[in-house]
Curated annotation (Swiss-Prot):
One of its GO terms (molecular function) is ATP-dependent peptidase activity. This is ATP-dependent Clp protease proteolytic subunit. Fourteen ClpP subunits assemble into 2 heptameric rings which stack back to back to give a disk-like structure with a central cavity, resembling the structure of eukaryotic proteasomes. It is found in: Cytoplasm. The lineage of its organism: Bacteria, Pseudomonadati, Pseudomonadota, Gammaproteobacteria, Enterobacterales. Cleaves peptides in various proteins in a process that requires ATP hydrolysis. Has a chymotrypsin-like activity. Plays a major role in the degradation of misfolded proteins. Keywords: Cytoplasm, Hydrolase, Protease, Serine protease.
Amino acid sequence: MQCSHNFKTPYCHRMVVVPTVIEHTIRGDRVYDIFSLLLKERIIFMTGTIEDSVANLIVAQMMFLESENSEKDIHLYINSPGGVITAGMSIYDTIQFVRPDVSTFCMGQAASMSAFLLASGTKGKRFCLPNARIMIHQPLGSFQGQATDIAIHTREILKIKNNINKLMAKHTGQSIDIINKDTERDCFLSADEAMKYGLVDCVLSQRI
């Protein structure tokens, strides 16, 4: 998790051809990109670095799905190395705010802020695939400037660290002391280890 907003562009399809799907209806054919079609099934993808533009899209999709049906689950699929703290926290707050349960799935990796978001899904509905990798650690700071300003930002990032660790303890069931210790450095967990830790509830080897 980082406080800096200087990142390479995430979640960008400029270099990737996004598949399209033709849906045949009595009113004619409609063409959807694959992500829009999955959104109709209440599936949201969170991939790449989490920054403001990515967070805004995910928040908007969750709010839209809530307005469509406040009773049906939202499914958030995660394959992300993490990203900006404030962007991630906007997603976190929305997960807690919307009425539908939010089921989280890790495929590939959930590191840093994305691991925190994986754990923040509805209890009992947090999953990962067998070869997924999860990594937790403390926030990263990259502020530059005058000594007084650096001290101000240091105090702020320590407050953020304490808040996130308290929330992580709440969602995993681990003690705050364990969370503080394990996030002091990069802590990598396999799918089974993440389940034992309380970051996910189940490792899926096949569809439920």
